[in-house]
Amino acid sequence: MRQNYDDRKIVKQYREIARQIVRKEGLYKNMDQDELREQTNFWREKFKTKPMTERDKINIFALAREAASRIIGLDAVVVQLIGALVLGDGKVAEMKTGEGKTLMSLFVMFIEVMRGNRVHLVTANEYLARRDREEIGQVLEYLGISVALNESGLDKDQKKAIYTADVIYGTASEFGFDYLRDNMVRQKEDKVQSGLDFVLIDEADSILIDEARTPLLISDRKEEDLSLYQTANELVQTMMKDDYEIEEHKRFVWLNDAGIERAQKFWGVESLYSAEAQVELRITMLLMRAHFLMHKDKDYVVLDGEVLIIDPHTGRALPGRRFNDGLHQAIEAKEGVEVKEESRTLATITIQNYFRMYKRLSGMTGTAKTEEEEFRQIYNMDVVVIPTNLRVNREDMPDDIFYTKKEKGRAIVYEVSWRYEKGQPTLIGTSSIKSNEWISSLLDAAGIPHQVLNAKNHAQEAEIIAKAGKRGMVTLATNMAGRGTDIKLDPDVHKLGGLAVIGTERHESRRIDLQLMGRSGRRGDPGFSKFMISLEDDLLEQFESKSWEKLSTKLKRKAPRDGKPVNSRKIHSVIVDAQKRLEGANYDIRKDLLSYDEVIDLQRKMVYKERDQLLERNKLGVSSEKILREVAEYSFIHPLELEEEELEKYYSRQKELLGGTKFPISFDQVTLMDPVEVVEEIVAWHKKERNKFPVETITAIEKEVYLNLMDQMWVMHLDAMVQLREGIHLRAYGQQDPLVMYQKEGAQLFEKFQADYHFYFAHALLELDPDGLIQG
């Protein structure tokens, strides 16, 4: 994207600072390693008591620049230093691919460590984390900064050691899962993650935007009648188009009156929306989503009898990841493979809410400006476009637009064939496995050798991308496979025009299109890009517009059948409009996800805070006597204020509180006593029994029981919140705002959760045996 006025103003401001940094290169030239490390220690100590000035910043950058020059032979140029200064301000730096974002990261990490912050560097995958840790990590270590790699599969002691480092490389999911696991431990000493000071996110658009729709989940198996999925599959297979309404771009489908009648007859229920039919309704809706919204070889792939999710932004399969809340089981039933048990959520957080917990956040990527509003609204980060060091030498051609996919296919083959004949390497980008395999079959038929990269062979990704810049190589890849790695050109390819990029469809996001184009023309290399699209492409097929339908019909009716592209400003404007609308719709989905998660996020923070305090003190925050008194008063005295018809549930509550405990007064006797007297008897008896045990023993027992109950009830509460959210969306076509309903009913569920674990803790207190153990 081009710079706007604000970008130019910021870049101009920082350009002079960057030039001063370069002019300082002689300052540290004659120092040996020990002397450079002394400088590092000097700055670290200074900023423990004093603020950092602009002059300090210039000297610190110059120190890191000298170290990079010595260790990896790279002298940071002015634009890289400008980018680092932007990152230091907590912004997103948009820097073209190949311009040196990895080196740029060195400076902001080094200066944040000097400020006393622990730094997390987040990358898109473990391969990139390992690569960057090795390259930039050695520079930081040369200066006396400790660096670690946070990988999956490490044990607790290894994780604890990693989190003592000044700079830690890893993936978003690994940092997020460490946070969730830390809030499931039984002892304070078992926590591994230290403070969340500063995080720098590479490929920030991919992690903070594209991955934001998928929450991080820790789960276990949930008992469920899996045969219901196959049964519901039979129902959905019989449905006609008249049975449901669909808004595919919003990923929403619902039953109309005819569909409701069909489903009620199938399940044998009077009302599909009654409490008795909740399970049948839920699984029916899941199978409808699986059949009508989830598409094989686009949203998922079936390999070796297993359904694998396809990352919509990279085209990669995601082994081990499953769609949430029964959708994966529904797809398995649809595809006729084994339906595996649904998972039960033990802990969850969205990418958005995890990273918003850091004190400071910044990001870098090749494409972010189109999503600036989202970065600003959700993460409070502006996007600044950093100029390139060398002029971009890529020729970006206008789109070739064809009436049909068939005509487009023929034109793509012709375009690729003549480039192949002259030896120019070509990268063909597709949006799905289906279109990837279709183009591959056309190239095969034309006798054009090529390599294919999609979710079905992602294991060979690095090898395939490494060959993509070779003379005469044709590479066919889904979306942005290979992002984060350079396509290096053979020396003799430059005179052939560099790498040619052919896009076969416009994507839902303009940003993904820009990423594909950005694979070519790096660091001043020559290059070429062009999109070859048709009126039958998915983007336009799902674009609901009467004016477009009218224009499309008119164009197809008048279309000359010569296979030549049509150049129409109207079509171009429709495509841009479609992308903007879909970007807006996807942003709304992510914003909606965040709005709902903020309800559970507030609750999660309250629970985790209480948990932390419990682990820190190693005992209850309030006395067990106080909790028992509150529960007893609510169970016995509160009902005095109620009407007769409300009393029944309190009789059951009283019985449950005392039933099976060691409390010496029988329930029959209790019902004849004054409620206030009952409460005092309960509290007095507990106090007497508690005093029989050593203080350390009873304190440890109370802490362990309280923690157990809170954790168990929290898992049940998370499940209840999932069910509530699903139900709320099914009621979304009523008069009430579903989010407001979710907030209100979610708060009620949270109050119930708190009351429940206090109640069962009080019950457990009355079960203490003489040995100080809890029975039951």
From Swiss-Prot:
A molecular-function term among this protein's GO annotations: ATP binding
Domain of life of the native organism: Bacteria
Keyword ATP-binding: yes
Keyword terms: ATP-binding, Cell membrane, Cytoplasm, Membrane, Nucleotide-binding, Protein transport, Translocase, Translocation, Transport
Name the record gives this protein: Protein translocase subunit SecA 2
Lineage start: Bacteria, Bacillati, Bacillota, Bacilli, Bacillales
Catalyzed chemical reaction(s): ATP + H2O + cellular proteinSide 1 = ADP + phosphate + cellular proteinSide 2
Residues that coordinate or bind ATP: 80, 98-102, 486
Nucleotide-binding is among the record's keywords: yes
SMART domains: SecA_DEAD, SecA_PP_bind
Record-stated family: Belongs to the SecA family.
Gene, per the UniProt record: secA2
HAMAP family reported for this sequence: SecA
One GO CC term on file: cell envelope Sec protein transport complex
InterPro entries the record matches: Helicase_ATP-bd (IPR014001), Helicase_C-like (IPR001650), P-loop_NTPase (IPR027417), SecA (IPR000185), SecA_DEAD (IPR011115), SecA_motor_DEAD (IPR014018), SecA_preprotein_X-link_dom (IPR011130), SecA_SF2_C (IPR044722)
